[in-house]
Amino acid sequence: MEDHNLEEFRQRWQEELAHSQVLRRRRRLEAGERRPRRPEAGARGEPASGYLGLAQGLLEGAGRPPAPRPGRTDRKDVSSRSRSPPDRDAAEPEPLVDQLIRDLNEMDDVPFFDVHLPYELAINIFQYLNRRELGLCAQVSKTWKVIAEDEVLWYRLCRQEGHLPHSRFSDYTCWKLILQECLAPVHLIRPSWMNRKGAVSELEHVPDAVLCDVRSHDGVVIAGYTSGEVRVWDTRTWDYVAPFLESESEEEDPGMQPYVSFVRINSSLAVAAYEDGILNVWDLRTGRFPIFRFEHDARIQALALSQEKPVVATASAFDVVMLYPNEEGNWHVASEFEVQKLVDYLEIVPNTGRYPVAIATAGDLVYLLKAEDSARTLHYVYGQPATCLDVSASQVAFGVKSLGWVYEGNKILVYSLEAERCLSKLGNALGDFTCVNIRDSPPNLMVSGNMDRRVRLHDLRTDKIALSLSAHQLGVSAVQMDDWKIVSGGEEGLVSVWDYRMNQKLWEVHSRHPVRYISFNSHSLITANVPYEKVLRNSDLDNFACHRRHRGLIHAYEFAVDQLAFQSPLPICRLPRDTVAGYSYDLALSFPYDSI
């Protein structure tokens, strides 16, 4: 009985196995009919599966991998969308020529962007792209290339990057090529920066005075001295004779003049504030005499000048005054603000529209001063005075000093001018932050200097210190950066140039007095060493001329000497042959008199 049951079980098992093999073979045949690229498997009678089927598909498709197998629910949609419906009865592979034609037809499909967007709307979208992004878009398709190489886009890029600001769109026919020509000298100047290859000039000093303050704008330098004199240089032309800007007090009282406390300059105006509270404003285009004079009752503690508009802000005692001309061109007091403490730092916010906006720090108070409005407190924490200040078009950055371990060290606070709230708290250093630069820094980056002798590069997106450089022997007094380098000045008189991408110091120069001012552009650098003491020191009591080492220094570095050599020779090369002054500069010049 048991043998009979066992035999019956074996027979049923063999029938089920045979039936399952028939079903499996039928399914494979149906699948082979649905896919016309691999019909040989059904013709051979043994369907290929797994890795064997993949290899056969690669061989039959001439190196092209087989398309993924569609699901059961998508097979009807795929067959309905195909360009040529598959022949279920065909058993031969598709010719390679037909496959090539079908692939070319698929490449002719136009992207959605090209079909549905008008050309004018595409231009408006592409105007927010930079040079690199436009180059990438030109590689997408022919239509995108036409849009990405539109002359209007490259004309706007050329203007945004500061090239040919006074040119019109009709002046050139290929603005992309013009931008390439404008950028070519920049790539040639960078090696000169890295190797300190160029010309250095020490601006002529007033012999009987000590340097008090220095500022510059687009190569034009202004300096004030203890003798009350204000001098202007144009470093863009080597043969420029620096004039003195005269004041009305010199004509009234020809004796000892008050010290110059602050000087400021922009493209058209020069401003100087004196120790006795006098403020003079000169128009650089009209003459050497001031066009406006304003007098405070007390000493001027801070001075600011807008770089775009004729707007001047001064702080004296507990008052902050904004001055600018009216519609007739007459200067007047436009706004006056009262603050609770003496002002330490004062800056005018750029690009504010009709009404100018200023930022003032007074002890532990930071004020937002808008013309035609009252003073508003932007920041206040008792016992945390501000130690430095800088502003950009949308943000203000200032260092705060922490008194005690509770506040976790000194920081730099970044505020939004539009929202009037704190965006970032950066730093956490033991020393006081002595300088910060957000106006000239690349987007989302900021550089600062500290009394702990370190220069810090801050990433505003992460609120972290991206780089920290041990730059100076004493505290850092001035700092500025661009897209690849940092230039810093220290209290010991050292000017250092860093390539922060490689975390490497390129070169440095040293002078006697602290570095109080640094400004550079793509091809030039201006530094000023201002002494601590403003008193004349000389061993000869009968001679009031100040010794050279106590005056202070202003240096102008030019790294595009090859370009300037065709415009005018250097001053040392214009000396006559019978003088020996040309050999006292310790410069390795080859044939300095060949240009005569």
Curated annotation (Swiss-Prot):
The modification N-acetylmethionine is found at residue 1. The gene is Fbxw8. The modification Phosphoserine is found at residues 82, 84. Residues 29-43, 71-91 have a biased composition (Basic and acidic residues). Substrate-recognition component of the Cul7-RING(FBXW8) ubiquitin ligase complex, which mediates the ubiquitination and subsequent proteasomal degradation of target proteins. The Cul7-RING(FBXW8) complex mediates ubiquitination and consequent degradation of GORASP1, acting as a component of the ubiquitin ligase pathway that regulates Golgi morphogenesis and dendrite patterning in brain. Mediates ubiquitination and degradation of IRS1 in a mTOR-dependent manner: the Cul7-RING(FBXW8) complex recognizes and binds IRS1 previously phosphorylated by S6 kinase (RPS6KB1 or RPS6KB2). The lineage of its organism: Eukaryota, Metazoa, Chordata, Craniata, Vertebrata. GO terms for cellular component: 3M complex; centriole; ciliary basal body; Cul7-RING ubiquitin ligase complex; cytoplasm; cytosol; Golgi apparatus; perinuclear region of cytoplasm. Its main location: cytoplasm. It holds the Pfam family F-box-like. It comes from Rattus norvegicus. Component of the Cul7-RING(FBXW8) complex consisting of CUL7, RBX1, SKP1 and FBXW8; within the complex interacts with CUL7 and SKP1. Interacts with GLMN isoform 1. Interacts with OBSL1, CUL1, CUL2, CCT6B, PFDN5, CCT2, CCT3, CCT6A, CCT7, VBP1, CCDC8, ARF1, TRIP13, PDCD5 and GORASP1. Interacts with MAP4K1/HPK1 (when autophosphorylated). Associated component of the 3M complex. Interacts with POUF51 (when phosphorylated on 'Ser-347'). GO terms for molecular function: ubiquitin-like ligase-substrate adaptor activity. Pathway: Protein modification; protein ubiquitination. This is F-box/WD repeat-containing protein 8.
